[in-house]
Amino acid sequence: MKYDVAHRRIWLKGEILDVNDAKVNVLSPTSQFGLNVFEGIPCYWNEETNQLYAFRLSDHYDRLIRSAKLIQFDLKYTKDDFKKALVDTVKANEYDENLSVRQTLFVDGFGSWGSEGPVEMFVAPIPRGRTSAEYNKKGLNCCVTSWRRISDENLSPRIKCGANYINSRVGQREALRNGYDTCI
């Protein structure tokens, strides 16, 4: 059965479930301190083969593992676990369109920013909406934001973690507030 976005199936802690049934402790280190690392894996639907193809999956998983090591997560998952979770999640949703699959490792349970674990994972498919080909036809109205990328000495941008994207959020909000589609 194909699920709508509001009721899509996600993978959380080894189980496929409705996104609305997913639960993460609000006092977990991931909720309180942004202790997570993630990949947004582009997947492209091919009409001729009726197949979904993940783009550079191994490279994405190498970066996810590298980010987890840099942020000092104890990983219980392997690249094979990552791939199986992604495939199972996509199959559970029966999507036949381009996706960005968010694969996130996070610190759950109770604890502080120094907590060791437990390190858990969720996998969530997100329909991509417009493609770059559509943007190429219409164009994008962009601005250069006043917000700058963080320095490697502060919070390393080599770690793909949620906390590293706050500047992107405030830059995007600045662009939208000023009438632009996005920011550079």
Segment roles from a protein language model:
Residues 1-74, 84-88, 112-184:
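Helix-start/capping segments and mature chain N-termini
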Residues 82-110, 126:
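Short, acidic/charged, Gly/Pro-enriched secondary-structure junctions
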